Design a protein with these regions (language model features):
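Formylglycine-dependent sulfatase
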Residues: 1-429
Length: 430
């Protein structure tokens, strides 16, 4: 099936933030001490899903589930991401959102974290190098280090992970990153992960995403994007924010009442606002589905923000990232879909973001085969009629990095473990 755009097939922007808590966003938690005017504006123009859950309470597995419609605990996929130089966690041949949309004529771009590893082996000088002996010097950078581009995306600007010696203790390694465009060093420089500029990361991918929108609108010529014809686009924007390290840039420091963490969320909100503005400036807003969510709940440093600032990143929920308590998997989910989702509405039905593939497949009339999106259940009906509670939605399953499972269905939560805790919950908080 091919989509004839004719300005009718909608563009899709999907923002998947990193460790953004349900309680960080004003439209989800009015008591938040962080101003999020752009997210609030998006909510006013669309639907707030008040009970949306990620496929896992941890970064990589959550992204695997979102992009494949398959639970990451199947085949132990992504319960732990493993070694820094493991191969791409999405299996070769597994249908992804990008591959599905590309199959009906979409141009697909990813900009941000990725978080699902890469085809490192193809770029090694010696493909037989043992994992623990691989370092940045092991690669032939004339060969691309690919991840998104071999899983359905036409373009990527991503922070590729590298393991490097810890400057404080050279006997151990730490993880760092380097910007790669379509698998190659983005600046044409020597790759030097020890000097990765975290402050430049969010501004850089934001600027590039704006340029991508301009190129899709025909107001910019950019060969690197590989846009060969006018076609609808899918932009998967997955910034490493507000994940540690907390690096808000100078204009955003002091703009919240929740310290550096809150200021970093304000910068994220500004970044999202710039994408929204670029769509409006280029006449694309009314033909673009715009969705914002997060890969899991907030990092456990949020407990110190409670003590210091009185800001609850998990809102009134218990649990944080990695936990099977709801604060680990319940996340903001905002959808603006002109002509389909009623503006200023709210849906209370428990849904799983693993349903993204089935939702878009239903809208486009795509029939998924028995091996694709096996755990994905459409929530298109909830988008069209958000104030209708649908008890027939199937249970949502999610898990901790340990592999402990939890199930959310209607008003119930079942945790298949002695406790929902995986991160450390301080005694004073209980």
């Amino acid at each position: 099936m091919a989509v004839d755009r004719g300005m009718t097939a909608p563009n899709i922007v999907l923002v998947y933030a990193d460790d953004l808590g349900y309680g960080d966003v004003k439209c989800c938690n009015p008591a938040s001490k962080i101003p999020t005017p752009n997210l609030d504006r998006l909510a006013a123009q669309g639907v707030v899903f008040a009970d949306a859950h990620t496929p896992a309470a941890i970064c990589g597995p959550s992204r695997y589930g979102l992009l494949t419609g398959r639970y990451p605990w199947r085949n132990d996929r992504g319960i732990e991401l493993g070694h820094a130089y493991d191969q791409c966690k999405i299996e070769e041949g597994r249908l992804t959102l990008a591959a599905m949309l590309g199959g009906i004529g979409y141009h697909c771009a990813e900009m941000g974290k990725w978080g699902l590893r890469y085809d490192y082996r193809s770029a090694l000088r010696d493909p037989a190098t043992p994992l623990d002996e691989i370092g940045p010097e092991s690669f032939d950078y004339s060969r691309p280090i690919l991840g998104p581009n071999i899983r359905g995306f036409d373009y990527s600007l991503t922070a590729v992970m590298f393991a490097i010696p810890d400057p404080q203790n050279p006997a151990r390694t730490i993880k760092s990153k380097w910007m790669m465009e379509n698998g190659r060093a983005a600046d044409g420089e020597d790759v030097d992960p020890a000097n990765f500029d975290w402050y430049a990361f969010l501004p850089r991918i934001t600027e590039r995403a704006v340029e991508y929108i301009e190129a899709q609108a025909g107001s910019r010529d950019e060969p690197a994007f590989g846009i060969e014809r006018q076609q609808p686009f899918f932009l998967y924007f997955d910034p490493h924010v507000p994940h540690l390290p907390l690096v808000p840039n100078a204009p955003f420091r002091g703009t919240s009442e929740a310290g550096e963490y809150g200021d970093y969320v304000v910068e994220l909100d500004d970044s999202i606002g710039r994408l929204m503005q670029a769509l409006e400036d280029n006449g694309l807003a009314e033909n673009t589905i715009f969705m914002v969510s997060s890969d899991n709940g907030p990092e456990s440093v949020c407990y110190e923000q409670i003590r210091t600032y009185g800001h609850y990143s998990m809102g009134d929920l218990r649990g944080v990232k990695r936990d099977n308590w709801e604060g680990g998997s319940r996340v903001p989910f905002l959808v603006r879909w002109p002509g389909l989702a009623p503006a200023g509405t709210r849906n209370e039905t428990p849904i799983g973001l693993i349903g993204m593939m089935a939702t878009l497949a239903e809208y486009f009339g795509i029939e998924l085969d028995s091996e694709s999106g096996v755990d994905s259940h459409s929530f298109l009906a909830q988008m069209r009629n958000p104030e209708q509670v649908c008890p027939e939605m199937p249970p949502v399953v999610y898990h901790t990095p340990k592999g402990d499972l939890a199930l959310r269905w209607n008003g119930w939560v079942y945790i298949d473990a002695p406790s929902g805790m995986c991160s450390h919950e301080p005694e004073w908080f209980r």
